[in-house]
């Protein structure tokens, strides 16, 4: 588990070293790491809670205990939930338990982590995606206080915001459009092994994992068909290269700008307040994007268990 975390986590500090002329870590990078770490711990605690809580339907039948379905006894619930959270936060794709057998909200944790694709994320790509959220946060906060948006002494203007918005939208568009196609294309939905809320979760997870280049899946989905193999391959290809190209264009636009010394009127990016605001904006932006689909999937399934 630790080996999966080292490189993506250390790249945040590498970014901090690159911002400093001396051999020091820029405090802005530390604040980004704090935001990532707090969100990671929050998702881990959520997954642990719902997995140890178990299945309400079984509790009504007098069968107490956590959710051990799909898990090896040598790992148990705790280590399985930990591995699940790490492998999807750091997008490695390895598994030590069946994600399809997680409780609805326990299974929503890896799904949401891949939807964000920025809580550490993959090597390099996770940091790039987080910087998109950072620039969106700086832009919105600057407008809220009536200041010219700027990041690290470089003004964020219309051209950059268009590219930032496009880069932000690629990931959810690929997930949602191809998930919709899975229910529209004749025969594609035959792969579903669950006709209700969990079937929606299986489809969402499949394309979320493909778009995040993760590799794990809700393996109850019979996805070894022409539609699923081709569609997930297209999603992997587009989700990998389009954001990278857009982010390179953002960087090339910013580096050609005249930089200036940051002053007190700018949005502060080197304190815990910025980390808190960054977390809030990530939750708000992602919630507005994915919450309706999560309601049709894991959240609806959890409510059904309590019905």
From Swiss-Prot:
Highest taxon of the lineage: Bacteria
Keyword terms of this UniProt record: Cell membrane, Ion transport, Membrane, Potassium, Potassium transport, Transmembrane, Transmembrane helix, Transport
Membrane-crossing ranges are 30-50, 75-95, 102-122, 125-145, 164-184, 234-254, 272-292
Any one cellular-component term (Gene Ontology) = plasma membrane
Q: Which cysteines does the record link by disulfide bonds?
A: none
Subcellular locations according to the entry? Cell membrane
**Protein role:** Part of the high-affinity ATP-driven potassium transport (or Kdp) system, which catalyzes the hydrolysis of ATP coupled with the electrogenic transport of potassium into the cytoplasm. This subunit binds the extracellular potassium ions and delivers the ions to the membrane domain of KdpB through an intramembrane tunnel.
Q: Which family does it belong to?
A: Belongs to the KdpA family.
Q: Which PANTHER family match?
A: POTASSIUM-TRANSPORTING ATPASE A CHAIN, POTASSIUM-TRANSPORTING ATPASE POTASSIUM-BINDING SUBUNIT
Return the protein name. Answer: Potassium-transporting ATPase potassium-binding subunit
**Source organism of this protein record:** Staphylococcus aureus
What is the name of the gene encoding this protein? Answer: kdpA
């Amino acid at each position: 588990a630790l080996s999966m975390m080292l490189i993506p986590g250390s790249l945040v500090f590498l970014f901090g070293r690159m911002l400093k002329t001396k051999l020091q870590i820029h405090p802005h990078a530390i604040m980004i790491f704090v935001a990532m770490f707090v969100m990671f711990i929050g998702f881990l605690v959520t997954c642990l809670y719902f997995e140890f809580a178990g299945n309400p339907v079984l509790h009504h039948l007098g069968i107490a205990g956590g959710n051990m379905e799909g898990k090896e006894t040598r790992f148990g619930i705790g280590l399985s939930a930990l591995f699940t959270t790490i492998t999807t936060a750091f997008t490695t794709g390895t598994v030590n338990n069946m994600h399809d057998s997680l409780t609805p909200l326990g299974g929503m944790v890896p799904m949401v982590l891949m939807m964000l694709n920025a809580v550490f994320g993959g090597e390099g790509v996770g940091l790039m995606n987080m910087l998109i959220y950072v620039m969106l946060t700086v832009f919105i906060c600057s407008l809220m206080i009536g200041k010219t948006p700027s990041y690290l002494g470089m003004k964020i203007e219309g051209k950059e915001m268009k590219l930032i918005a496009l880069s932000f939208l690629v990931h959810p568009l690929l997930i949602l459009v191809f998930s919709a196609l899975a229910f529209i294309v004749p025969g594609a939905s035959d792969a579903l092994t669950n006709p209700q809320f969990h079937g929606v979760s299986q489809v969402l997870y499949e394309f979320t994992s493909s778009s995040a280049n993760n590799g794990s899946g809700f393996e109850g989905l019979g996805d070894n068909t022409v539609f699923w193999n081709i569609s997930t391959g297209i999603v992997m290809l587009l989700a990998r290269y389009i954001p990278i190209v857009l982010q390179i264009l953002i960087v090339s636009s910013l580096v050609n700008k005249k930089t200036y010394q940051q002053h007190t009127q700018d949005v502060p990016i080197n304190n815990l307040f910025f980390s808190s605001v960054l977390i809030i904006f990530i939750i708000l932006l992602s919630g507005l994007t994915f919450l309706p689909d999560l309601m049709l999937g894991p959240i609806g399934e959890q409510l059904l268990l309590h019905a």
